[in-house]
């Protein structure tokens, strides 16, 4: 792993993340590293990235915190919110409460030259 569970726990202000078992934080870090690899086209395993640049570490910590929050909250995976006040209750469909952190600006200088993410490729067929 490029970062440690203690890095995520010490960065976060959320008790759910700070109190999350290290084994689960390690899995959240794996998800964060996979997400960063999708953005940049590599896994930061080259000796060029030893020590890990601060921007990359911050991006990984932010992503790992996001995955820790999402993976520890069942209601975050649903876009429905339910609220009850006395005899009145309602359910709202929305975007969910936890927003994925925007880390592209932190990782853009580390994108592999010529790399085009799979999601941005166009599929064209001839007529």
UniProtKB/Swiss-Prot annotation:
It comes from the Bacteria. InterPro entries: DUF3199_YqbG (IPR013514), YqbG-like_sf (IPR036558). This is Uncharacterized protein YkzL. The gene is ykzL.
